[in-house]
Amino acid sequence: MMKKLFTLLICISSLLLGFTSCGDEAFDVDSVNRQTLLVFMPWSGSSNTASLYENLRANVDSMCAGIKAQKGLKNARVLVFMSRNSQESNLFELKYDDSKKVVVRDTLKKYTDGAFYNSAEGMASLINEVKQQAEALNYAMIIGCHGCGWTYAADWVNYPYHARPNLGGTSSNYDYWGSIQFGDDPDHPKSRFFGSVSLDDAKIDIATLAEGIKQSGIKMQYILFDACYMGNVETAYELKDATNFLIASSSEVMSIGMPYKTIWSSLISTAPSYSGIVSGSVNFYAKSDAPYCNLAAIDCRQMDKLASIMKEINASYTLHSSIPLDSIQPLGGFRPNIFYDLGVYVDSLKPSGYLKEQFTAQLKATVKAAQSTEKVASYIFVNQGEEIRVKSYSGLSISDPSQNSVAIKGREKTGWWKATH
């Protein structure tokens, strides 16, 4: 028996040695592409207006500056999908030329079939193209465009006009805020609603994005939404099977977007610094002439647990009629408000000690990093902007208490509502 066991151990050892020395050359672990970052910048305008196009181009320039500051990309690759107009888009790679100390843009593929990405199949085909061009151990995604949280564009009837502030009077400064952009007809917005399924070909539903990522067979390490109002429980819950982390703002985002050069080292690392991304972005704006920004990093893998506790709370508690809605921290400028701070809302429900402790602990586990300036701003209704003081910011908003007709019509269709009621 001992002889048989000894012989078996020798065979196993030989087999393992064979696996580790089957080639003449040793496997170079450092040569593996560890992360591919897809920067997704779909068309944000209409057939005859460019909207955020110049801002998005400036964002790519800022990324290039970050790459130069880091003297390259090391074990990472960056592919950018950018729409030039409503029909044409390019997929190109940012490459660092070490000899010239510059970042070059290598075009990989040109698209002339419009907004093919507005379906799950189209989104999956784009991600699969990225995988084919730059296979990696991990994938992450930055999405730069307009946004209006989880809401469905089909539920809007009369849109508010969006007036952009004129900061300095130049045309470049005039397009300063990355919120909702509307044309002369308030029933036909030219902005991008993540949540739209029927407004026009340039709209993408959050569920469509999530399904497209899942169809590609990967799960993102993180998704950074450089867009307004995407930091909400409804969106985070919808993306829980598509990404590990969601980085997003619960309020309006300036059209100049995230300070990519400043936060680049935190973004491109194989172990991203979520606290670095959040603090770097908020501190950048806090020191600027327009000190309005909040941002949070959400662990979407914790969303099921958060929903489970929220369901227990909703089963026993409702918002008392004596509590005014304006006492719950607003994070947006819609009238009536759509986006309320999640932590303050739950406090307003006044759950029992046990449930409150459970919720607080789970919220802390879900929100890995969150930071806000003292105020955020909204330019939806007011040409010169209106400031919203932020006394409390948990890192996520919720639309459960909203009396806005869009929220009332749409929230029960969300996965979050179904999981918590």
Regions found by a protein language model. Give the residues of each.
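Solvent-exposed loop/turn segments at secondary-structure junctions
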Residues: 43-47, 84-88, 114-115, 145-151, ...
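Bacterial Sec-dependent N-terminal signal peptides
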Residues: 2, 14-39
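Functional beta-strand-loop-alpha-helix junction segments that form "active/interaction loops"
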Residues: 47, 87-88, 95-133
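Surface-exposed loop and adjacent secondary-structure segments within mature catalytic domains
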Residues: 83-106, 143-196
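Terminal, contiguous helix-loop blocks that mediate binding/assembly
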Residues: 30, 168-421
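N-terminal carbohydrate-binding/catalytic regions of secreted carbohydrate-active enzymes
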Residues: 52-68, 72-86
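Loop/turn elements at helix/coil->beta-strand transitions in domains of secreted/extracellular proteins
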Residues: 33-36, 72-78, 134-140, 217-222, ...
